[in-house]
């Protein structure tokens, strides 16, 4: 068993070296971020959140500055929506809408039936002007499984729970075919695929990939290891931030590993793409996720 495991790891390593043109450079954008998450390339600049500081930071290509702060938010993700910006506030269980200047326009506290959110975590565009977002539930492997996915209509007026009983729903992305939504089920160590109906609701779910089947485990993994951010890249591949393994797994549409991006931080949280598509990859991660002040860093890989 051990010999076969080493052989598989070597085969995957060779695959990663041969699979694509290597990254030529790595830049540390912010070496002292406080649990960074949710990177978003927008209007020629990078925005990202600091979860443990409830900040949004901005990098203009030269320097980092504070864009927005709200005590108690626990900012976890960002997405553009109707010319504005949505912020997932994990700690306050809300979604905040900001205008282009960072002014708060509204705070969304419940879905259209009056149900509150449990830990808004990440966003994905639905391809028709609306937004999906995950509400993770409790980050505890022994807690009841209450993770959900919600949908915000294109006009921003209707918010509907479209999936539930997910073991800590986390990153999500529209699939390449536009007919499926991929959702990270973090505490189950896998990525789910949901059928998307014409009205944006979600139907049948299947297991799209188990991380243990994509790549061999790393020595320091624990029970909380799993997929965090998930993004469909401009190159048609899926980028999966593996929290707890210091890496981003890159898989094709057939769920075959294309390459591994090794990251200095153990707790890799999310991915975004810059002005040159898959040739500019932003990655956020934390060195420590169990003890304040939760130090982390923001990186840029270029080809």
Kindly give the residue locations of the regions a language model identified.
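A short beta-strand motif characteristic of beta-propeller blades
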Residues: 25-30, 63-69, 105-113, 158-163, ...
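Beta-rich, blade/repeat-based domains predominating
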Residues: 30-45, 51, 70-89, 94, ...
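Flexible "stalk/tail and boundary" regions
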Residues: 43, 59-61, 81-82, 99-101, ...
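Beta-propeller domains
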Residues: 47-66
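Short, solvent-exposed loop/turn segments at conserved positions within beta-propeller repeat blades
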Residues: 51-52, 90-91, 140-147, 186-187, ...
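A short loop-to-beta-strand structural motif that recurs across blades of beta-propeller domains
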Residues: 55-57, 94-96, 147-150, 190-192, ...
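Hydrophobic alpha-helical segments and helix pairs
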Residues: 102-159
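Short loop/turn segments immediately following beta-strands, especially the blade-tip
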Residues: 194-201, 294-300
């Amino acid at each position: 068993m051990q010999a076969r495991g080493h052989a598989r790891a070597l085969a995957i390593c060779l695959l990663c070296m041969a699979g694509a043109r290597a990254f030529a450079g790595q830049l540390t954008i912010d070496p002292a971020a406080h649990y960074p998450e949710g990177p978003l390339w927008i209007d020629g600049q990078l925005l990202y959140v600091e979860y443990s500081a409830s900040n949004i930071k901005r990098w203009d290509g030269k320097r980092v500055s504070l864009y927005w702060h709200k005590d108690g938010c626990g900012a976890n993700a960002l997405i553009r929506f109707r010319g504005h910006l949505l912020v997932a506030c994990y700690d306050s269980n809300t979604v905040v809408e900001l205008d282009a200047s960072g002014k708060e326009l509204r705070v969304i506290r419940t879905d259209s039936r009056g149900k509150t959110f449990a830990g808004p975590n990440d966003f994905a565009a639905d391809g028709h002007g609306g937004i999906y977002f995950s509400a993770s539930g409790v980050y505890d492997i022994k807690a009841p499984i209450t993770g959900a996915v919600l949908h915000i209509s294109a006009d921003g007026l209707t918010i509907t729970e479209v999936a539930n009983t997910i073991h800590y729903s986390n990153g999500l992305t529209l699939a390449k075919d536009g007919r499926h939504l991929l959702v990270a089920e973090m505490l189950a160590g896998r990525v789910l695929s949901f059928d998307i109906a014409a009205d944006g609701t979600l139907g049948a779910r299947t297991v799209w990939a188990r991380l243990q089947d994509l790549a061999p485990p790393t020595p320091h993994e624990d029970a909380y290891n799993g997929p965090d951010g998930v993004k469909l890249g401009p190159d048609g591949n899926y980028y999966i931030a593996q929290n707890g393994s210091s890496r981003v797994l890159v898989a094709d549409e057939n769920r075959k590993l294309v390459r591994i991006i090794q990251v200095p931080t153990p707790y890799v949280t999310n991915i975004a793409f810059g002005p040159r598509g898959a040739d500019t990859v932003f990655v956020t991660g934390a060195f420590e996720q169990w003890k304040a002040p939760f130090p982390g860093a923001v990186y840029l890989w270029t080809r």
